[in-house]
UniProtKB/Swiss-Prot annotation:
Domain RRM: 36-114
Gene3D superfamilies: 3.30.70.330, Zinc finger, CCCH-type
Name used for this protein in its record: Zinc finger CCCH domain-containing protein 42
Coiled coil: 319-348
Compositional bias ranges of the Basic and acidic residues kind: 210-230, 243-296, 304-352
InterPro entries documented for this protein: Nucleotide-bd_a/b_plait_sf (IPR012677), RBD_domain_sf (IPR035979), RNA_proc/Spliceosome_comp (IPR051847), RRM_dom (IPR000504), RRM_Ist3-like (IPR045844), Znf-CCCH_4 (IPR041367), Znf_CCCH (IPR000571), Znf_CCCH_sf (IPR036855)
Zinc finger (C3H1-type): 130-157, 180-207
Chain segments carrying region Disordered: 156-179, 210-352
Lineage, opening ranks: Eukaryota, Viridiplantae, Streptophyta, Embryophyta, Tracheophyta
One term under GO cellular component: nuclear speck
First and last residue of the signal peptide: none
Keywords from the named record: Coiled coil, DNA-binding, Metal-binding, Repeat, RNA-binding, Zinc, Zinc-finger
Claim: RNA-binding is one of the keywords in the record: yes
Gene Ontology molecular function: RNA binding; transcription cis-regulatory region binding; zinc ion binding
Length: 352
């Protein structure tokens, strides 16, 4: 809400209570009977604590004046808190000075219910509190504009040791970490995309990055070079390094095995017979096999139905022809019925 609107609202409340003759116990001032502080807003920036004493002391003795100033520049922010020795003086100040004109500015005077007096801290206490809060991140980036009014520490040494300071000081962020090499090589560094530099938690060893197969394109071939020398690993199934490997037996056992067959790769006792070496089971199968061998196999043969199982549709357009046939028959039947109806009508006319 606009401060001038608040000033007018307070003046309306006071005028209405005065017209109605409301007692002090029922007045809105009784809500702040336990507070001797008043809030003063809209103060001209040139006024000092002495000027405020001169203006407000006419309604009672003032025991505390807190003119809020900027901690960096020391300039007034335009509002203050005053405390009277007698609480009844606050009622007089609010009723008489609210909306008053001081050096061309309308000031607002109102009760202050829960004001806590700010204890002034000495420089040593202020420094200790800043150190406890930590280093200012904006100061580490060189962007803090609060100066001495900042709540956080501006210690350049601490800023350099956190890794958030200047570029040359950020390397100290992970210097205490002795297990950095144990975490492995940074994959972003291997691809040439890591931007963390020395602050990265993972190793940036170029030699190790080259032997992992994750580095540059010419170094990725070294990923499996060690397996070429070591051969098949213990317990593996590499055919090139097995002494008992038999191509024919392995191929036949692979063809005949099912999913989850534990006998794969083991010599079987029974004789393996290729199914293709067996004779044809029927004459049709024999003819089909001969056609496949000679290249004269008709694919349409496999698309036909068996006469014993289902009917064979020789003509692809038979369905449309059947539909036309049924349609023509229904048309003839309808014409015949109409002709019979006309004949019956003519016979009746003759009788009449």
């Amino acid at each position: 809400m606009n401060p001038l609107t608040q000033v007018k609202n307070l003046q309306k409340i006071n005028a209405r209570e005065s017209d109605l003759g409301i007692s002090d116990e029922a007045s809105w001032h009784a809500k702040y009977k336990n507070s001797a502080y008043v809030y003063v807003g809209g103060i001209p920036f040139d006024l000092t604590e002495g000027d405020l004493l001169a203006v407000f002391s006419q309604y009672g003795e003032i025991v505390d004046v807190n003119l809020i100033r900027d901690k960096g520049t020391g300039k007034s922010k335009g509002f203050a808190f005053l405390a009277y020795e007698d609480q009844r003086s606050t009622i007089l100040a609010v009723d008489n000075l609210n909306g008053a004109l001081v050096l061309g500015r309308t000031i607002k005077v109102d009760h202050c219910g829960a004001y806590k007096k700010h204890e002034e801290e000495d420089e040593e206490t202020r420094r200790q509190n800043r150190e406890a809060r930590g280093v200012c991140r904006a100061f580490q980036r060189g962007e803090c504009t609060r100066g001495d009014s900042c709540k956080f520490s501006h210690d350049e040494k601490r800023a350099a040791n956190t890794g958030w300071g200047h570029e040359e000081d950020r390397s100290s962020k992970w210097d205490h970490d002795k297990n950095r090499e144990g975490r492995g090589v940074c994959r972003a560094f291997q691809r040439g995309e890591c931007t963390r530099g020395d602050s990265c938690k993972f190793s940036h060893d170029e030699k190790r990055a080259a032997t992992t197969g994750w580095g540059h394109e010419e170094d990725r071939s070294s990923k499996w070079d060690q397996d070429k020398l070591n051969g098949a690993k213990k317990g593996g199934t590499s055919f090139g390094n097995r002494g008992d490997f038999k191509p024919d037996v392995e191929e036949k056992s692979y063809r005949g095995r099912g999913d989850g067959d534990a006998s794969y790769g083991r010599p079987k006792e029974r004789e393996r017979v290729d199914r293709e070496d067996m004779g044809p089971r029927s004459r049709d199968a024999y003819d089909m096999k001969e056609q496949k061998r000679s290249g004269r196999y008709d694919n349409a043969y496999s698309r036909r139905h068996n006469d014993e199982i289902d009917y064979v549709r020789e003509d692809k357009g038979s369905r449309a022809q059947d539909w036309e046939k049924r349609k023509a028959e229904s048309r003839r039947d309808r014409n015949d019925r109409e002709e019979k109806d006309r004949d019956s009508l003519r016979r009746e006319d003759r009788r009449r």
